[in-house]
Design a protein with these regions (language model features):
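Conserved catalytic core of the tyrosine transesterase superfamily
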Residues: 1-318
Length: 318
C-alpha cells in the first residue's frame, strides 16, 4: 500500500505505556458492551496494523498523532479490501477513538475535525443475510427432536426463542429463567442493544419447547439457556456474552439438518419479514425487534420481489 506512509510507523508508535484512563482506545472500548468491545477492538487492531505495517496494535498506536492524510488513507485501503458495511463499522471505531483523544485533550480541535472528516462508503444496495423458509425451520426442529437428549432439547429451545422472539444472540445468552413467564409467553429483555428494555412474546409451540428444556434444566435461578456437555450434564451458567456459542450451536444444527448456511441473526430477518408479511405495521415490528428506528426494521425485510408483484396486482387500472 504505497499511499500509506510506512516510514511514519515509528512516529505513530507510543514510546511509553499510557494509563488506561488516558488512552483513547481504552476509554472508548470501556464504554461498549462485551460483545461490541470484542468486535471494535478487532477493528482498531486492524487499523493500527494497516497504519504501521503490522508494528502496532490498538494499544501501542498513538492515536493522537493521526491526521487527515492517515484517516483518508485508511478509508481508501478499507474500501478496496472490505465490504461497505464492514468498512463503515471500522470507520465508526476510528472516529470514536479520535473523539476520545480530543476529549482527553490529546489532539487539538483543528487536527481532530480534519481527521474525522471522512465519509462513509456507499453500499451496493445488496441486502445482507436471508430469511429462512418454513421448511428449513421445520427441518431444524425435527433434527433436534429426532436426535433427542439434553443437548438436542436445549438446542430446540434455543431455535424456538430465536425464531419466535426475534432476539439477538447476545440478548439470548443474557436471559435469566426469571425473564420468562410461561403462562403468558412474555420474555423480558432487560438489557438489549443500547441498554434498552423490551418485552417479546413466544408462541405456544415455542413455549412447549422451552418447557421441555426446563423439565431437565430445572427451575433453579440463573441462566435460562445453559451449556450441556456430551454426557448430558447441565452447567447452570450463561454462555459467553459475545454469543459465539450460540452461533456455533446454530451452525452445527444447520449442518445436521442439511439446511443452507445462515446466521443466528437471520432468525431476526425472518421474524421481521414474517410479521410484515402478516400485515403488522412497521412500528410494531420495530418495537418487538428493539430497533432504534423503523428504517432499520425495513432493512430486515426479506419478502423479496413477490411482495411488490402482489402489491401492483391489487391496483385497479381505472
Amino acid at each position: 500500500m504505497s499511499y500509506l506512509l510506512y516510514s511514519q510507523a515509528a512516529q505513530l508508535k507510543l514510546h511509553e505505556p499510557v494509563p488506561v484512563t488516558l488512552h483513547p482506545a481504552a476509554v472508548y472500548l470501556s464504554s461498549l458492551s462485551q460483545g461490541s468491545r470484542r468486535s471494535m477492538l478487532s477493528s482498531l487492531n486492524a487499523i493500527a496494523r494497516l497504519l504501521t505495517e503490522g508494528e502496532c496494535d490498538a494499544f501501542s498506536l498513538d492515536w493522537s498523532k493521526l491526521r487527515y492524510h492517515h484517516t483518508a488513507a485508511v478509508r481508501t485501503a478499507l474500501k478496496q479490501r472490505l465490504a461497505p458495511t464492514t468498512t463503515n463499522k471500522m470507520l465508526v471505531a476510528l472516529r470514536r477513538v479520535l473523539t476520545e483523544a480530543y476529549r482527553l485533550d490529546l489532539i487539538d480541535a483543528n487536527d481532530f475535525h480534519k481527521a474525522v472528516d471522512i465519509s462513509n462508503v456507499k453500499g451496493t444496495g445488496k441486502l445482507r443475510g436471508r430469511a429462512l423458509t418454513g421448511g428449513e425451520i421445520e427441518s431444524l426442529i425435527s433434527c433436534c427432536h429426532e436426535q433427542g437428549g439434553a443437548i438436542a432439547i436445549r438446542d430446540a429451545a434455543v431455535l424456538a426463542i430465536l425464531r419466535c422472539g426475534g432476539i439477538r444472540r447476545q440478548e439470548l445468552v443474557r436471559l435469566q429463567i426469571a425473564d420468562l413467564d410461561l403462562a403468558t409467553g412474555e420474555l423480558t429483555i432487560e438489557r438489549g442493544k443500547g441498554g434498552k428494555f423490551r418485552i417479546v412474546y413466544l408462541t405456544n409451540e415455542a413455549i412447549a419447547m422451552v418447557e421441555e428444556w426446563l423439565e431437565i434444566r430445572g427451575n433453579h435461578p440463573g441462566a435460562l439457556i445453559c451449556p450441556v456437555n456430551k454426557g448430558g450434564n447441565i452447567t447452570l451458567r450463561h454462555f459467553a456474552e459475545d454469543g459465539d456459542g450460540i452461533y456455533k450451536l446454530v451452525k452445527a444444527r444447520a449442518t445436521m439438518a442439511g439446511v443452507k448456511h445462515f446466521s443466528p441473526h437471520d432468525f431476526r430477518r425472518t421474524f421481521c419479514s414474517d410479521l410484515l408479511a402478516e400485515g403488522e405495521d412497521v412500528f410494531t415490528v420495530q418495537e418487538l425487534a428493539g430497533h432504534a428506528s423503523p428504517a432499520t426494521t425495513a432493512k430486515y425485510d426479506r419478502r423479496g420481489e413477490g411482495r411488490k408483484r402482489r402489491a401492483v396486482k391489487r391496483l385497479k387500472f381505472k
